[in-house]
């Protein structure tokens, strides 16, 4: 019989203060690393797409859903139009009007209860950024958006509610 002990010292006592704007910038950097590794140009960080992405992340968090579509059925393209943003990239007979990735992460990687009190193993900003990009790159549809050669710009939107981190990435 083996007993596994986890000293409480392994678990950080304080919840980290994650700056959403700094996290957005770091995710953008890591996305560009993936594109360059694939022989593609880095994406321009678009403030307009960022505002649209932030709005969607905030909406998902505040209304407790996780989807590309709002509870009323509003699509990513509808959000672009509502914000007065137009993305129309013509390649031959095909027209691209944008793309979107979403991800829900956590501020912690594990929790241990000691005498009924939770002790969290908090994630750093870097861990959240890397696990988000890794999650997208390991999903065929999300990877396809990230490595789509016709996309030239992206906006990342992060919203933190409780211990959850909502992340939206919009492309054009």
Q: Can you describe what each PLM-predicted range is?
A:
Residues 1-7:
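Bacterial N-terminal signal peptides
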Residues 13-15, 19-86, 143, 149-155, ...:
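Short, well-ordered surface patches within globular domains
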Residues 42, 101, 170:
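Conserved beta-strand positions that form and line the central face of beta-propeller blades
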Residues 76-165:
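A well-ordered secondary-structure block
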Residues 165-168, 172:
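Low-complexity, Gly/Ser/Thr/Pro-rich intrinsically disordered linker/tail segments
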């Amino acid at each position: 019989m083996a007993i596994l002990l986890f000293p409480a010292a392994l678990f950080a006592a304080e919840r980290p203060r994650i700056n959403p704007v700094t996290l957005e910038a770091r995710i953008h950097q890591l996305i560009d690393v993936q594109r360059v590794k694939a022989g593609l140009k880095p994406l321009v960080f678009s403030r307009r797409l960022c505002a649209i992405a932030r709005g969607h992340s905030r909406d998902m968090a505040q209304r407790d859903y996780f989807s590309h579509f709002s509870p009323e059925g509003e699509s990513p393209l509808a959000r672009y139009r509502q914000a007065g943003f137009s993305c129309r990239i013509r390649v031959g007979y095909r027209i691209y009007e944008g793309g979107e990735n979403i991800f829900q992460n956590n501020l912690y990687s594990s929790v241990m209860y000691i005498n009924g009190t939770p002790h969290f193993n908090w994630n750093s900003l870097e861990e959240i950024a890397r696990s988000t990009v890794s999650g997208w790159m390991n999903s065929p549809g999300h990877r396809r958006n990230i490595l789509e050669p016709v996309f030239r710009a992206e906006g990342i939107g992060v919203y933190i509610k409780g211990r959850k981190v909502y992340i939206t990435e919009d492309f054009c």
